[in-house]
Amino acid sequence: EIIRPTAFFKSLSGQIDRVKKGKSFLIFGNGELTSCKPISARDLSKFIIPLVTRSQSENKIHIIGGPGPPISPKRQAELLFELCKKEKKITHISPKLFLVITYALIPLSIVSKKIRDLREFLKIAYYYATESMLFWDEKIGSYSSNKTPEYGNESLEEYYKKILKNDVVYKELKDQKLF
């Protein structure tokens, strides 16, 4: 069994501190290039337990999202500014910047493992900045939020509220700061 959540709440929380400090929210492209249906760790655990405890495996990929409509980075930014009661400031960054830097670092990557690792991170960042984390519908050749299975009842908005009230221990994120 492969369980593929569309996104985790934590992975969409990297810019909370920026917004709380009144800084701009970083968005790739127009902020509508990608979307996902994030799921909480608790809801995902409840989804996984019956799969791993059953007697026979189905040997399939389980794409799973949280409840409700998909959220784009633009909507995520709007939600955070609203919850933090801050003026909306958004900085748009071209996702192609990841590719430009990746290619510019090729010569240095020959002699440096750190640079090779950085190039790999930039490739992954480009993917996440340009591809939705939803069900890929082969018939229509695009992502489908309608066909992305939903599970649970915890929302990203409620998670953000808990972080902002300090009801959830929120640790500094490293790689998630862009998302």
Predicted regions and their residues:
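General small-molecule cofactor/ligand-binding pocket signal
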Residues: 89-93
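Secondary-structure boundary/capping signal
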Residues: 23-24, 88, 109, 116
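Oxidoreductase cofactor-interface core, primarily capturing Rossmann-like NAD(P)-dependent enzymes
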Residues: 1-86
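Residue-level detector of short coil/turn "hinge" positions at structural boundaries
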Residues: 87-88, 170
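A hydrophobic C-terminal alpha-helical subdomain
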Residues: 96-179
